[in-house]
Structures are given as C-alpha cells and as structure tokens.
Amino acid sequence: MAEPQEKSLDDFFAKRDKKKKKDKGVSGSAAGSRGSARPPDGAPSSSSSMSGAGKGVKKEKSGKSDNPDQLQEKEDDEWKEFEQKEVDYSGLRIQSLQLSNEKEDDENEKKEEQGADWEETGGYGTDKSSGPWNKTSQAQAPISAVTEAPEPVHTGGVYRPPAARASVSTRKPQGPPEIYSDTQFPSLQATAKHTESRREKEMEKTFEMVKHKNRARDEATKNQALRLQLDNQYAVLGEQ
C-alpha cells in the first residue's frame, strides 16, 4: 500500500514542476516581444545611449587621472614642519633638566665630529677627554734626603764589615769546653736534679731547720722511754 502512495506523490510534484516551467516560458516570450518593439518618440535611441555611456567612461578616466595629483597635494599639506614655540620656564624648576639635555647634545656632537677615530681608539661611549689619565697629578711632598754618618776611615789593617766589627768587640776569650757542666752538656739527670732542687727550695720556704736548740727536750723524751712500769696491773681483779 505504501508504494502506490509514493508514486502518486511523485506524479503530483512532477506535474507541478511542469506547470511552473510553462508559466516561465510564456512570461519570457512576452518580454522579448515588448523589447523588440520600437520605443516611443520621447525615448532616446540606442546610439545616443551608447555615446552617452562612452562620454561617462571618458569622464571617469579623466577624474581618476586628476585624483593622484590631488592626493599628492594633500599628502604634502599633511607633512608640514612643526615649529615649537619657545616657552619661558624661568618660574618653574626645569632649568637644570634643560642644562643636562644641552650637555648631552654637546657630547653627542663631539662624538660625531671625532668619527672613525673614536671607534679605533676604543671610545665606545666614553669620552677620553674626561678621565683619570687627564687629571693633574698632585704635587708630591718633597722627600727629605737621609744623611748617613760617614764611616771612620782606617788607614791600615784588613777591612771588616760593620756586623763583623760588632761581633768581634763583644766576643770573650773562651777556654776548653767543660765536660761535666750541665749547661754545656745537658742530660736527663740534670733535669731531674733541677726538679729536686726546686722542691727543696719550696720546702725550705715552708719549714725551718733548727739545730742544737732542743737538746734538753730530746733527753727527757729518751728518759721517759726508758722508764719501766713495774706495777701489777691485775691487782684490781684480785680485790674484787
């Protein structure tokens, strides 16, 4: 049942399209017949219309040729030099800034004048005219000349330097070395004796040696030691 319905719809749309095509063909033929007809007396002819079109094209071309000159004149008018008016800044505190700018301009002019020599000498932004090498060296204080005393001149004898002379004057005649002296031939025993002597000295500071002053006391102590206890120590026990 679905297939015959689809066919009927297709036939309906096909017929509709055919009718539209026929209507378009009829309207086109009518317009062509009207165009082929002669225009009225008041209307301009085709030749006059063509000539008018040619004149319009020529005018457009001439207008285009004139436009570039006008554009150049306008551009020239736009690039006018601007002249800055001088203003009095004496009331304001801007003079220092203006002076610094003037100094920078002067330095740039000097660098431009020097040209290639500036780069060859290795300037690269530093002015060689101002530097520590151009500063005037301060006057050095005069160095006082040291006057040395003249040495005594010896007419005879052998020359000796001053150091040798001083050593000779301080020397003393030396005899043979002392073998048993601890100072010339030190040993470990000498150090031990030295420590003992130091101890003895310290003991002497704290104790006093007394000789032959307490003989009576010594004899009394001896007699007490010689006494014998002959009493019966156990007699007390017998009495009880």
Swiss-Prot record:
It is found in: Cytoplasm. The keyword 4Fe-4S does not apply. The modification N-acetylalanine is found at residue 2. GO terms for cellular component: cytoplasm. Residues 127-141, 181-192 have a biased composition (Polar residues). Residues 27-52 have a biased composition (Low complexity). This is Protein CDV3 homolog A. The keyword Cytoplasm applies. It comes from the Eukaryota. The gene is cdv3-a. Its main location: cytoplasm. Belongs to the CDV3 family.
